[in-house]
């Protein structure tokens, strides 16, 4: 399972973005070579009391018309209810209670999701009385904060983490491998899942997932136990396309966050699109295990070079996914669908792989002997030792002499040496460099 998801909901100009940015701190980062992923910063990683969680800003555009605001608030509340484990409902202590606040509070009450009600813009003790009228919303005790000044945020976060399912932080492995099928509507995600379930005929149950557009299907096979998550995406028509796009991204991101293996499905008759690159970019950022499946391969006119050319074109567009596994199938005819779960299991095993410290350091020592680090300025990086500190994804820490002696091309060389030596095909890996004295 992924980290808990916390969604921030509120009217325009109540301080959602201020709170989001204050909590995220410096944890929002733009990853190079990942097109369009973090430019619209709808999510960020955060931590409180050693609990890591993901924050989602349901904001979007900021209309001025009151009717549009209420419609937007309904959408925000829906997306929070569907994707989040805990909801922060932020209201404006200076402006007071509004019709839109009441509307959303009603939806949140019905959802039964944990809600933390925060009254923002309470910048001093004199303004604390402004919070009391929000008891009328009927969703618990209002907590007075000032997002701009950082006042009251600790108490608010204490309340948020109280609602987390602490069992997800246990080290024990989940017995199910979670696979998220991601991609545009109508590329064949549901068809493939139905094919896999139909062939195996050992469905445990169909359980409504965290969003109205996701269905979690439990499946047991010779390859292991799987949960297949079909992310249908938003299909509602709306004039506010940017807003709908944002909510679609949030839904998809929530599915990716909770997955072990992410399968990007592409329509062979359309090829890859910018939206595909953006979607799989999230999985790459989180260093998930990744497969790219090209569906409807039966509809493509082929010769003996077609598959190789198509794959090379894909890899050219997805340069940041050099480690991903590729598979060409037809969910309709069943062509190569029998290989999907085998390949997913292979990617997952690499995602969950652990390397002993002794063997790891032997490989790094040999890599340095074959090609020593370049001199950066007047210093050359020296690696004292390396160790693996986590799996899912594999995370390594290299202890070095000087941070300023690092060079991106040599770091890429070391990552390639790890991948070649230990077979991390199909999964992202993370390498952290820490300076220490000799």
Swiss-Prot record:
The biological process GO terms on file are: ribosome biogenesis
Q: Where is the EngA-type G domain?
A: 4-168, 177-352
Residues recorded as binding GTP 1, renumbered to this chain, are 10-17, 57-61, 120-123
Keywords in alphabetical order:
GTP-binding, Nucleotide-binding, Repeat, Ribosome biogenesis
Carries keyword Repeat? yes
- Family annotation (InterPro entries): AAA+_ATPase, G_ENGA, GTP-bd, GTPase_Der, KH_dom-like, KH_dom-like_a/b, P-loop_NTPase, Small_GTP-bd
Q: Name one Pfam family in it.
A: MMR_HSR1
Molecular functions per Gene Ontology: ATP hydrolysis activity; GTP binding; ribosome binding
Q: Which residues form the KH-like domain?
A: 353-437
According to the lineage, what is the superkingdom?
A: Bacteria
Which protein family is named in the record?
Belongs to the TRAFAC class TrmE-Era-EngA-EngB-Septin-like GTPase superfamily. EngA (Der) GTPase family.
Name the PANTHER family on file: GTPASE DER
Purpose of the protein: GTPase that plays an essential role in the late steps of ribosome biogenesis.
Assembly, per entry: Associates with the 50S ribosomal subunit.
- Write the protein's name: GTPase Der
């Amino acid at each position: 399972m992924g980290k808990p998801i916390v969604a921030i909901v509120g009217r325009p100009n109540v301080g959602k973005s201020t709170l989001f940015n204050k909590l995220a701190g410096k944890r929002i980062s733009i990853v190079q070579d990942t097109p369009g992923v973090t430019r619209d910063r709808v999510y960020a990683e955060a931590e409180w009391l050693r609990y890591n969680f993901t924050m989602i800003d349901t904001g979007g555009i900021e209309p001025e018309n009151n009717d549009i605001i209420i419609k937007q608030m309904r959408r925000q509340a829906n997306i929070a209810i569907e994707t989040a484990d805990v909801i922060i409902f932020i209201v404006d202590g200076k402006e007071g209670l509004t019709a839109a606040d009441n509307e959303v509070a009603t939806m949140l009450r019905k959802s039964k999701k944990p809600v933390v009600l925060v009254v923002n813009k309470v910048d001093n003790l004199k303004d604390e009385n402004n919070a009391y009228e929000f008891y009328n919303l009927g969703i618990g005790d209002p907590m007075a904060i000032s997002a701009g000044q950082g006042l009251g945020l600790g108490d608010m976060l204490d309340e948020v983490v109280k609602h987390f399912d602490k069992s997800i932080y246990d080290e024990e492995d989940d017995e199910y491998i979670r696979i998220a099928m991601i991609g545009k509507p109508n590329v064949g995600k549901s068809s493939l899942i139905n094919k896999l379930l139909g062939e195996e005929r050992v469905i445990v149950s169909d359980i409504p997932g965290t969003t109205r557009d996701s269905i979690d299907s439990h499946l047991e096979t010779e390859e292991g136990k799987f949960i297949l998550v079909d992310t249908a995406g938003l299909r509602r028509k709306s004039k506010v396309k940017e807003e709908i796009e944002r909510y679609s991204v949030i839904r998809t991101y929530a599915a990716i966050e909770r997955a072990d293996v992410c399968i990007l499905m592409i329509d062979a008759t359309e090829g890859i699109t910018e939206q595909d690159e953006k979607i799989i970019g999230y999985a790459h950022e989180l260093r998930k295990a990744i497969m790219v499946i090209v569906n409807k391969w039966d509809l493509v006119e082929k010769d003996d070079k077609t598959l190789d050319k198509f794959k090379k074109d894909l890899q050219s567009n997805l340069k940041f996914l050099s480690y991903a596994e590729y598979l060409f199938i037809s969910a309709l005819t069943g062509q190569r669908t029998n290989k999907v779960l085998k390949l997913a299991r292979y990617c997952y095993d690499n995602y969950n792989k652990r390397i002993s410290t002794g063997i790891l350091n032997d490989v790094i020592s040999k890599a340095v002997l074959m090609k020593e680090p370049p001199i950066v300025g007047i210093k050359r990086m020296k690696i004292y030792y390396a160790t693996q500190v986590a799996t899912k994804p594999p995370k390594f820490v290299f202890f070095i002499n000087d941070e300023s002696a690092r060079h991106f091309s040599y770091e890429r060389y070391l990552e390639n040496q790890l991948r070649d030596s230990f077979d991390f095909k199909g999964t992202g890996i993370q390498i952290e460099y820490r300076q220490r004295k000799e």
